[in-house]
């Protein structure tokens, strides 16, 4: 009897173990599958997960930037690659980890759960939501963390006053598209944008990126939003090397126009070439910066200054060339004050050599003293009597010949003096042109240096202050 009872107990234990054994070896995947089926049985993703009608879902919002792709000054756009950190609580997605093998979190497709419709308000390409619907992390207490990546083109008002030493303040405003503040509230996860994985941009540097919560009212409703402000600083090395330095070189080439001699036409040729080069630079800048009538960019002001500078240099060069080619033959006599100022005083002030090619030649007498004495003696002899009449006739012939020679010498002398006077006038005007060149050289050099300093100093001061 005892043996039968023992056998019966053994069979019962084996049967019980056979029935209970599968429940002890349930895999984690099966448990997670059971959890998902239990959680989403009857779950409606279009319904806001609240218990009471006056409950508000608080969404903790944060931003992480990975790349500043582009800042388009022409179209007022900023292109960024970011991650949107969103965290909220869904009471319908809670479970007890002990009932499901200690599972504390699961990953579910974001398309299957309720999502706060947070979008970028200043979007410029029509893509207001994140570009990729990634999975969301759901914890056992109902906390949901969703960090979708997104590529945004946001509108940004550009201030190019100090281009290329400018800074830009671009903002990204996020908020719910349909829910007001009584339904969905936004709070900042962090006051700063996460830049730990930021990939540096070759043209722009992010000085600061902070977030701030705000709210706008529309009638009786209040709509909370979060604004992230990016302070961007341009790295001006490229524009300095390929834009500003060539412009500086062209401005100083304009100054060197007044160092060239006026005999040839290189002065006008150089000035015209500089003006054409500046026009090309202006067209290049026009393709970069936005077309705005509110402000003139710094580099645009400088190019405009140089173009006016070059235009004046061309006008002055024409005047100097005109002075250089003046003479008595062109009916331009030199006034006494011009001689005194430009031939004597200004050359000393400008450290120039004096005008030494100006000589005074004594007048040649019509008759030399010896000729006068010979003629006087001949006249006395002819008056004293008739002796030596033949000799006297010979002397008179020589006297007549000498008088003709004297008249010829006088004619040659007058011609030489006239040529010398013309040459002297020509040289005087050429020297006046040289003095004018030296004056305008210093004037334009001073104006170029002062203009460059006055235009770029405010921008450099602002750029170097941080």
Curated annotation (Swiss-Prot):
Q: Provide the transmembrane region boundaries.
A: 236-260, 268-285, 302-323, 439-456
Q: Which InterPro entries match?
A: Neur_chan_lig-bd, Neur_chan_lig-bd_sf, Neur_channel, Neuro-gated_channel_TM_sf, Neuro_actylchol_rec, Neurotrans-gated_channel_TM, Neurotransmitter_ion_chnl_CS, Nicotinic_acetylcholine_rcpt
List the Gene3D superfamilies. Answer: Neurotransmitter-gated ion-channel ligand-binding domain (2.70.170.10), Neurotransmitter-gated ion-channel transmembrane domain (1.20.58.390)
Membrane topology reported for the UniProt record: Multi-pass membrane protein
Organism listed in the record: Carassius auratus
Assembly mode: Neuronal AChR seems to be composed of two different type of subunits: alpha and non-alpha (beta).
PROSITE patterns documented for this protein: NEUROTR_ION_CHANNEL
The residues exposed to the Cytoplasmic compartment are: 324-438
Q: What is this protein called?
A: Neuronal acetylcholine receptor subunit non-alpha-3
Tissue distribution is: Retina, tectum and brain.
Q: Which molecular function term from Gene Ontology is one that the record holds?
A: transmembrane signaling receptor activity
Q: Which family does it belong to?
A: Belongs to the ligand-gated ion channel (TC 1.A.9) family. Acetylcholine receptor (TC 1.A.9.1) subfamily.
């Amino acid at each position: 009897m005892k043996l039968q009872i023992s056998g019966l107990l053994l069979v019962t234990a084996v049967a019980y173990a056979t029935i209970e054994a599968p429940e002890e070896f349930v895999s984690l995947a099966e448990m997670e599958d059971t959890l998902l089926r239990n959680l989403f049985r009857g779950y409606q993703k279009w319904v806001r997960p609240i218990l009471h009608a006056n409950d508000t879902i608080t969404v903790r919002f944060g931003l992480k930037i990975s790349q500043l792709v582009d800042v388009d000054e022409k179209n007022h756009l900023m292109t960024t690659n970011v991650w949107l950190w969103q965290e909220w609580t869904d009471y319908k997605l809670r479970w007890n980890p002990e009932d499901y093998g200690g599972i504390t979190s699961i990953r579910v497709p974001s398309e299957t759960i309720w999502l706060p419709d947070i979008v970028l308000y200043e979007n410029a390409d029509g893509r207001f939501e994140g570009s990729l619907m990634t999975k969301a992390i759901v914890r056992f207490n109902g906390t949901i963390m969703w960090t979708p990546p997104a590529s945004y083109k946001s509108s940004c008002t550009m201030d190019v006053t100090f281009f290329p030493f400018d800074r830009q303040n671009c903002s990204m405003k996020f908020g719910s598209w349909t829910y007001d503040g009584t339904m969905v509230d936004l709070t900042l996860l962090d006051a700063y944008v996460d830049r730990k994985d930021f990939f540096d941009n070759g043209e722009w540097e992010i000085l600061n990126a902070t977030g701030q919560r705000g709210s706008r009212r529309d009638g009786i409703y209040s709509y909370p939003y979060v604004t992230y402000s990016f302070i961007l600083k341009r790295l001006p090395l490229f524009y300095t090397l390929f834009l500003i330095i060539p412009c500086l070189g062209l401005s100083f080439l304009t100054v060197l126009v007044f160092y060239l001699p006026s005999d040839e036409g290189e002065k006008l040729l150089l000035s015209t070439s500089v003006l054409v080069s500046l026009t090309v630079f202006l067209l290049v800048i026009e393709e970069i910066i936005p077309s705005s009538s509110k402000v003139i960019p710094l580099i645009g002001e400088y190019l405009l200054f140089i173009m006016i500078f070059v235009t004046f240099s061309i006008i002055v060069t024409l005047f100097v060339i005109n002075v250089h080619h003046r003479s008595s033959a062109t009916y331009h006599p030199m006034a006494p004050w011009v001689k005194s100022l430009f031939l004597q005083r200004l050359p000393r002030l400008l450290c120039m050599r004096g005008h030494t090619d100006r000589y005074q030649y004594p007048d040649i007498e019509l008759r030399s003293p010896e000729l006068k004495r010979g003629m006087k003696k001949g006249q006395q002899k002819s008056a004293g009597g008739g002796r030596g009449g033949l000799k006297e006739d010979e002397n008179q012939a020589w006297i007549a010949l000498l008088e003709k020679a004297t008249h010829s010498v006088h004619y040659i002398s007058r011609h030489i003096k006239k040529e010398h006077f013309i040459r002297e006038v020509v040289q005087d005007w050429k020297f006046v042109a040289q003095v004018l060149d030296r004056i305008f050289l210093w004037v334009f050099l001073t104006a170029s240096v002062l203009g460059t300093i006055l235009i770029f100093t405010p921008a450099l001061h602002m750029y170097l202050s941080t």
